[in-house]
């Protein structure tokens, strides 16, 4: 993947301004509410009965933060995201058996959460860079499935 200077700077700027322990949980909670079938991967998380329960679930919060910290690894390794995520791809495909389409759903939820936080600063150009980054992440996580 070729990154322009603008794309690199934009991705680094976005992630430098995110509160991982707020945005991560909000993103995962949104995904679990909007796409309830994704809850099947989180059976050990306890009560996911409704949006309020999901939002207050400590395990959802913790895993959401873990996801954002995982994305931070991609930000720091933008030229080699595929290899950066090789082990995660194997884990999610072979051990956890996660449908790779769910990575795209989560990426879409993150885009919405980020857009809401950044407001008018999340211009079309910024969104294009962010979605390009997330598409590379999603592709890298799904690599083991091919």
Curated annotation (Swiss-Prot):
Known partners and oligomeric status: HbC is a heterotetramer of two alpha-1 chains and two beta-C chains.
Organism field: Trematomus newnesi (Dusky notothen)
More about this protein: This fish has three hemoglobins: Hb1 (major, about 65-70% of the total), Hb2 (about 5% of the total) and HbC (about 20-25% of the total).
Binding-site positions, heme b: 63, 92
Tissues expressing this chain: Red blood cells.
Function, in words: Involved in oxygen transport from gills to the various peripheral tissues.
Gene Ontology MF terms in the entry: haptoglobin binding; heme binding; metal ion binding; organic acid binding; oxygen binding; oxygen carrier activity; peroxidase activity
PANTHER family: HEMOGLOBIN FAMILY MEMBER (PTHR11442), HEMOGLOBIN SUBUNIT EPSILON (PTHR11442:SF7)
SUPFAM superfamilies per the UniProt record, alphabetical: Globin-like
Protein name: Hemoglobin subunit beta-C
Entry-linked Pfam families: Globin
Keywords carried by this UniProt record: Heme, Iron, Metal-binding, Oxygen transport, Transport
GO biological process: hydrogen peroxide catabolic process
Presence of keyword Iron: yes
Domain spans labelled Globin: 2-146
Organism ancestry: Eukaryota, Metazoa, Chordata, Craniata, Vertebrata
Family: Belongs to the globin family.
This protein's GO CC annotations: blood microparticle; haptoglobin-hemoglobin complex; hemoglobin complex
Xref: InterPro entries: Globin, Globin-like_sf, Globin/Proto, Hemoglobin_b, Hemoglobin_oxygen_transport
